Amino acid sequence: MHITVLVFNGVTSREVVLPLTVICDAVNPTVRWVALQPGPVHGFEPLQRFEAEAGIDTVEPTDLLLVPGGLGSVRMMENPEVVSWVAATAAEARFVMSVSTGSLLLAAAGLLADRDASGHWLASGVLEAAGAHPTEEPVTWQGNVVTTAGAAAAADVAAELPRRIEYGAPG
């Protein structure tokens, strides 16, 4: 199982760590860390840091594209290079999952156009302005795209994703 994680300065660390921990309890995935450019990325929380091995100039097929949220989400959704990378990588992914305000990036990439989507309640206006229909549901599936309201909901989804990816089990 291959997972691609988009990280950026201001990412909420638990939105990365919690779903990945749940997935790693079930399978031993290969995780590819991607950021604007390779190198260190600082999470929102003090002392939390991720090391991106690749920049957004490369797109590779993946089983799961994980797009977490955080204070840097709006800045990322306003970056056309990031939005293009999300759209291109999502097109190559078997599944796409956003956590909290990560849904803003999916909406900006056109993945949530005229679709229901979960996300952080404080960002529902921005999500709607980007063309999605915000819901109050903690999890919203739209085909192979799943949006979650936060880390706890993402952990619930992460518990079933390995089964869906590895065995093609229906949802």
Each predicted region: which residue ranges?
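Extended, subdomain-level signal for the structured scaffold at the beginning of enzyme domains
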Residues: 1-96, 105-107, 125-126, 133-136, ...
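A short beta-strand/loop micro-motif in the catalytic core of glycosyltransferases
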Residues: 96-97, 117
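Short FAD-binding loop at a beta-strand-to-alpha-helix junction that anchors the flavin cofactor
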Residues: 144
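A conserved active-site-flanking secondary-structure segment within enzyme catalytic domains
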Residues: 112-139
